[in-house]
Amino acid sequence: MSWMFKRDPVWKYLQTVQYGVHGNFSRLSYPTFFPRFEFQDIIPPDDFLTSDEELDSVLFGTLRGHVVGLRYYTGVVNNNEMVALQREPNNPYDKNAIKVNNVNGNQVGYLKKELAAALAYIMDNKLAQIEGVVPYGANNAFTMPLQMTFWGKEENRKAVLDQLKKHGFKLGPAPKTLGFSLESGWGSGRAGPSYSMPVHAAIQMTTEQLKTEFDKLFEDLKEDDKTQEMEPAEAVETPLLPHQKQALAWMVSRENSRELPPFWELRNDLYYNTITNFSEKDQPENVHGGILADDMGLGKTLTAIAVILTNFHDGKPLPVERMKKNQVKKECNSSESDKPGRKDTIKKTDGLSKEGSRYSEEPSISDVKKNKYSMSELSSSQPKRKKIAVQYIESSDSEEIEISELPQKMKGKLKNVQSETKRVKVGPSKIKEDTAFACALTSSASTTTKKILKKGASAQRVQRKLMFEERPRTTLIICPLSVLSNWIDQFGQHIKSDVHLNFYVYYGPDRIRDPALLSKQDIVLTTYNILTHDYGTKGDSPLHSIRWLRVILDEGHAIRNPNAQQTKAVLDLEAERRWVLTGTPIQNSLKDLWSLLSFLKLKPFVDREWWHRTIQRPVTMGDEGGLRRLQSLIKNITLRRTKTSKIKGKPVLELPERPVFIQHITLSDEERKIYQSVKSEGKATIGRYFNEGTVLAHYADVLGLLLRLRQICCHTHLLTNTVSSSGPSGNDTPEELRKKLIKKMKLILSSGSDEECAICLDSLTVPVITHCAHVFCKPCICQCIQNEQPHAKCPLCRNDIHGDNLLECPPEELACDSEKKSNMEWTSSSKINALMHALIDLRTKNPNIKSLVVSQFTTFLSLIETPLKASGFVFTRLDGSMAQKKRVESIQCFQNTEAGSPTIMLLSLKAGGVGLNLCAASRVFLMDPAWNPAAEDQRFDRCHRLGQKQEVIITKFIVKDSVEENMLKIQNTKRELAAGAFGTKKNANEMKQAKINEIRTLIDL
């Protein structure tokens, strides 16, 4: 198969050199090779504007019809019940056939042949989304009336009306509200009068607005609601904070609840859904789980661990094996005797002395003792960790990786299993450093164990049936690769030293694929990428062959794209209980929530159409009823506390103060001269665009000017790669056009900013540029072109675009630019001078204080390295170009409190990533402002979070009389917008005008 383009960074999805681990045993093996990318494999991005469900930004009108053939089908409907229309092009009797299904997916009947002939063309060509409601469904034996509404793009309205007119149909007026007042009359049918339709413009909200709206859903949470506390199981060593005890109590009650899910009632022996008017005899399955959406840094991981150990079956804790005290002491002494650099072998051991053992003396594949497994010493609140030294031996054809020291704590013991340290040949790979990181998480695996496991693999199909019949035991945790090590750390840190867990890290080409053995574990930990890879390969995926006791999605917003294979792999898992852990359940828009609800198996929202019709569309169009439904739903299945939330009058998290200071910088005469020259030239050009009314069509040029001004504020050397703002002209030769477009794209890519793709509204991934000089993510624009064939148009300027004309920036050109910059003679700048003065002054007062130096420009961070070295500072760095292993090493090095450890971390704005904890720092120097104030706040939260004991002081360097001061004005405006409410946001035209006003403010026009 071919690998698919995805919106996360490409390196993250090329992690196919992986490892299999159970508890303490790592496995290094040959890497797999990457098949080539193919156009047809491109996954649509985050449910963007060209997907089926987003074709409904405008309501065209209504149409009356009839459903026939009722007596031939088992599906039934109630009065005023919503129904779905489904094309059936392969129907042997009518190629235009359109089925009518109820909410449960059961066929009720089909549309009359004449009506189907008119609608089939509209549905097949995605000109409109057609939705139905049956006003009088009960007691109809042969036929029933149907009220249909047509939603689509404004540009498709004429085609829809013409198609209906061709078959003798006309649309009637739209309902007065987003709901239906069916008693007030019908839509138009054949030969009826024509009406003008009101246009409901879709409302687009910013990320800040959405986060604020989500927080507002919980403002009226009562003290007696979700505030009961519960103590965790005895096996949990770390004391829980009050808000974590509340979360534990709520999660346990959700898992054990027998209540009906939201919007369901029992009426006359039938279970009735109040938002779709659907009813059925069988009780809908309750949601045994939910969304833990606490703010970042409030300890969601510890809470999840507590749930796993506290709530097994029938409200009882997970039965775990306990070691005797003399055994614990013996193992701890053994750990302390390890010497750095010694090559260890894992020796054969006798059976462990246990209390209350659950198992017979048969070989165990994953007996994990917490004190042998943890990478942290529990002797202090800031545990010291032994590093796993990984030796690289380079050769022309391969790379040998050898574990030179395996910490005793990571080894554990296998009964009756021999294991030894090995050298393993690994073939060439572009991601060998990430492989080494993966290998470093745990230790080497036993060859004997592999034989035991593979022996049982042949019985997979038989075992699959048995596992669905038995009560499940195992919790499956799925997380991004970047936090895999964090989960291992957390289990080691928070579980008592005498507790044994059957724990398996499912990762790597040698990972155990026998569902029978996996299902005997207490915990299986894997990544989204591994789950997706297995799901897409031939044959059964082992993880999909097991009915899990519980599935936990860490950073669960990773499944927000409903079209991605990753999301499909997650939704297809079988489990009794389901949890989503995320501090940002809404990333870009309200539609991000659907995948989470579908994962929770919340009926009827497992089918996306009902979510869209009853909640998503009404809310985004400002309907109060839709907002009330959303509030009711969210409060039922979600628990969210922010850092400012209070419990019994006290803040959830009592953190030290976090003052923010703005330090104004005055440019030198030379810097100011360059700044004014660039500003005057660009201002004249953009002023011409305003006069011509084409400013948005030249948005790339505007960004280019703003970028150059921001770069000058930091350092004039950053201007090396910038180009003039002249765009492609009609007289350019193909090669000249290509060069100009590549330069424009390099201009945007070199900014290091959070420039968004206009389609998916996220940071650019695999960026390409069109002939009209607009930059998009390649998967986004390719899917857009594919969906709008043969007349695809640019989403920004509506000019014609073609897939053959998309240009990518060749990597060698970017590398060449970096080389040119590195050869320049270093000079300082006003901002660097101010930073160095502050750092030296800070070192004089307290040499132990650690600082983050944050910038959007990675090249600027490189320039800052020179004076840091000259002044004798010990520093480390974290940016998006670093392999995951290097990132982890950098973080661990910075968090180290020993003498000689780095006191400064150079951090790129976009490199924060999920699960990043930088509490060692108590000073933050923001070298340049971000467009998005939320992006700044997220970086500040990396050190201002649970575990921070010192006051965090933030300094923002802002150049006086510059674009940076104007950016602060824009930030304040965005924060004010974020204070609004659902239904009061700007529509598309107002958003465009706001963008134009922003440009005027930034350029001082």
UniProtKB/Swiss-Prot annotation:
Pathway: Protein modification; protein ubiquitination. Isoform 1 is expressed preferentially in bladder, cervix, diaphragm, duodenum, epididymis, heart, kidney, liver, lung, ovary (granulosa cells), prostate, spleen, testis (predominantly in the Sertoli cells of the seminiferous tubules) and vagina. Isoform 2 is expressed preferentially in lactating mammary gland and uterine endometrium. Interacts with SP1 and SP3 independently of DNA; the interaction with these transcriptional factors may be required for basal transcription of target genes. Interacts (via the RING-finger) with isoform RFBP of ATP11B. Progesterone-dependent isoform 1 interacts with EGR1; the interaction requires prior binding to DNA and represses c-Rel via a DNA looping mechanism. Interacts with GATA4. Interacts with PCNA; the interaction promotes polyubiquitination of PCNA through association with the UBE2B-RAD18 and UBE2V2-UBE2N ubiquitin ligase complexes. Interacts with RAD18, SHPRH, UBE2V2 and UBE2N. This is Helicase-like transcription factor. Keywords: Activator, ATP-binding, Chromatin regulator, Cytoplasm, DNA-binding, Helicase, Hydrolase, Isopeptide bond, Metal-binding, Methylation, Multifunctional enzyme, Nucleotide-binding, Nucleus, Phosphoprotein, Transcription, Transferase, Ubl conjugation, Ubl conjugation pathway, Zinc, Zinc-finger. It comes from Oryctolagus cuniculus. The keyword Lipid biosynthesis does not apply. The gene is HLTF. Residues 325-361 have a biased composition (Basic and acidic residues). The modification Phosphotyrosine is found at Y195. Phosphorylated on serine, threonine, and tyrosine residues. Tyr-195 phosphorylation is catalyzed by JAK2 in response to prolactin treatment. It is required for DNA binding. Residues 922-1005 are annotated as: Interaction with SP1 and SP3.
